[in-house]
């Protein structure tokens, strides 16, 4: 046998075997399933929970602790991000349907105002006393800012906090049985657990699109996650809910984590005190420009026009007397 002639053939044969995977065994890593007892429910029962709870909850005011995380892409780096976390911010939150929100954060320790944001269906205003800035803008973002928190809008908070009713005139809801990842209460390792998912399809004109996906835990039949989509099918809000409590027939979570993957920020709200359905006046959602503050109109940067407190952003930017 000519050793030098057969060696390349052997090497080639081994190479082909390696490429075809004959010498390797691949397997999927399957996480164990939770052994928690699971409850059964039909789609009508889950949809009724969403609609009934939404109808009962018309407004609330709350003491809240904020935890804000910002993820910003490093300059010149496509896969590297700078992450900043702002913790220990307490404050207040006022919410009134259909789309009124007031969000106040306090300076840790001092408890003076760190930020104050008011918004409705037409636009928002944001006061930042520590920087003497007053920011106004519309709710629509035509050109995202490279500063993630400049993309924060009240509807992102409002829609995540309150599970909207499923409108039978414009929406269709279907049930899917799926699985979710949960933590083992003993060792905190990831486990798979069966869940229910209500998929909401919305119709506008001749077009239907995926609007929301609401996940229910089968341990307690309460929602623990909601995905909200845009018209392009992107997830724009990923909200998770923990520790629901019953407030005289209104179910509301103790902690809400709101992730906005497109804009690159997330906000966790932990509620320490909640009061539901007490009257909240219109002026509680009005935020006027303080004298001497520099006004920043985000819509002049983005090219669209805002309406804030019944005024356009241009009108709101005029000096107050």
Language model segments and positions:
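An acidic-aromatic
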Residues: 24, 96-159, 293
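N-terminal leader/targeting segments and the immediate start of mature chains
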Residues: 22-88, 151, 302-321
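Long, hydrophobic/aromatic-enriched structural stretches that serve as scaffold segments
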Residues: 70-108, 112-116
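Generic short beta-strand segments
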Residues: 63-72, 106, 199-203, 228-229
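Edge/loop elements at the starts and ends of beta-strands within beta-rich repeat scaffolds
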Residues: 51-60, 84-87, 94-99, 117, ...
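Flexible, processing/modification-adjacent segments and terminal tails
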Residues: 44, 128-212
């Amino acid at each position: 046998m000519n050793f030098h002639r057969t060696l390349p053939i052997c090497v080639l044969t081994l190479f082909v075997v390696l490429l075809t995977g004959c010498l390797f065994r691949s397997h999927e890593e399957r996480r164990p399933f939770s052994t928690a007892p699971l409850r059964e429910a039909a789609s009508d029962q889950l949809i009724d929970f969403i609609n009934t709870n939404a109808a009962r909850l018309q407004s609330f005011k709350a003491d809240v602790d904020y935890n804000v995380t910002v993820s910003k892409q490093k300059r010149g780096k496509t896969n590297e991000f700078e992450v900043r976390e702002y913790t220990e911010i307490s404050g207040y939150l006022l919410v009134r349907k259909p789309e009124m929100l007031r969000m106040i954060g306090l300076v840790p320790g001092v408890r003076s105002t760190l930020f104050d944001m008011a918004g409705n269906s037409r636009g928002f205003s944001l006061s930042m006393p520590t920087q003497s800035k007053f920011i106004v803008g519309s709710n629509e973002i035509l050109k995202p800012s490279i500063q993630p928190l400049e993309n924060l809008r009240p509807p992102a908070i409002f829609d995540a906090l309150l599970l909207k009713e499923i409108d039978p005139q414009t929406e269709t809801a279907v049930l899917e049985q799926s699985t979710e990842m949960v933590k083992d209460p003993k060792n905190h390792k990831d486990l798979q657990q069966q869940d229910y998912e209500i998929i909401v399809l919305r119709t506008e004109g001749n077009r239907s699109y995926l609007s929301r996906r609401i996940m229910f835990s089968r341990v307690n039949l309460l929602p623990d996650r909601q995905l909200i989509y845009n018209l392009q099918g992107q997830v724009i809000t990923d909200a998770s809910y923990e520790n629901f409590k019953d407030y005289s027939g209104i179910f509301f979570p103790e902690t809400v984590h709101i992730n906005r993957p497109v804009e690159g920020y997330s906000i966790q709200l932990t509620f320490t005190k909640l009061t539901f359905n007490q009257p909240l006046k219109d002026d509680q959602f009005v935020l006027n420009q303080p004298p001497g503050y520099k006004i920043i109109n985000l819509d002049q940067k983005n090219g669209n026009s805002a309406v804030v407190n019944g005024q356009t952003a241009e009108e709101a930017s005029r000096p107050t007397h």
